[in-house]
Amino acid sequence: MKLIVGLGNPGAKYRFTRHNAGFMVVDRLAGAAGTTVNRRRCFSLVGEGRLNGVRVVLAKPQTYMNLSGLAVSALCRHYRLELADLLVICDDLDLEFGRIRLRPKGGSGGHRGLASIIAALGSSDFPRVRIGIGKAEDASAHVLGEFAPEDQSGLEEILSTAALAAACACREGLDEAMSRFNSWRLMSANGTAEV
């Protein structure tokens, strides 16, 4: 079993913000897994299903970003999962818009949701999918703002590709997913992409 956690903030106010890119990817994975992410468990909304034959738990913590570790550690305990069975999906200021990056482990990179998870788990040795949202002078306003109108045309392709990358990591392993998706980039405003 794999636990795929998309990071974000709960509530309609934050639904379409850059910081909720992880939630958006989990919503796309839910359709592919034949589930809905709407049951309350371990400070999260969860749904269970199968993704390419692999049993998955999809989760969206409801603790707000800075306390994501509370939910993730509770989920790992509840489902009795090892860190290798966890995949966290989040936004990344240090990655340009139109890029995704998978990593087997690493620091928080200043992402407070990741920092909370690392602190709660006592380890940074868990895989993650990072979705580039680009930098801005006011980082807080940027992550809590909605995607710019000029980014909307490519956003669906980015989120769908991140979902494919997560599914590939579950089915074929993280190394294969990194090989296949870390070089992917959205090529133009009309959503044309390359892998």
Curated annotation (Swiss-Prot):
Signal sequence interval, chain numbering: none
KW Cell membrane (keyword) present: no
Active site: 19
Reaction(s) catalysed by this chain's protein: an N-acyl-L-alpha-aminoacyl-tRNA + H2O = an N-acyl-L-amino acid + a tRNA + H(+)
Keyword entries, A-Z: Cytoplasm, Hydrolase, RNA-binding, tRNA-binding
EC main group: hydrolase
Site (Stabilizes the basic form of H active site to accept a proton): 91
Any one annotated GO CC term: cytoplasm
CDD domains per UniProt: PTH
Site label Discriminates between blocked and unblocked aminoacyl-tRNA, positions: 9
Matching InterPro entries: Pept_tRNA_hydro, Pept_tRNA_hydro_CS, Pept_tRNA_hydro_sf
Lineage top rank: taxon: Bacteria
GO terms, molecular function: peptidyl-tRNA hydrolase activity; tRNA binding
Places the protein is found: Cytoplasm
GO biological process, one term: protein quality control for misfolded or incompletely synthesized proteins
Pfam families: Pept_tRNA_hydro
Keyword RNA-binding set for record: yes
Residues reported to bind tRNA: 14, 64, 66
Complexes and interactors: Monomer.
Function: Hydrolyzes ribosome-free peptidyl-tRNAs (with 1 or more amino acids incorporated), which drop off the ribosome during protein synthesis, or as a result of ribosome stalling.
Family the UniProt entry places it in: Belongs to the PTH family.
Protein name: Peptidyl-tRNA hydrolase
Organism per entry: Desulforudis audaxviator (strain MP104C)
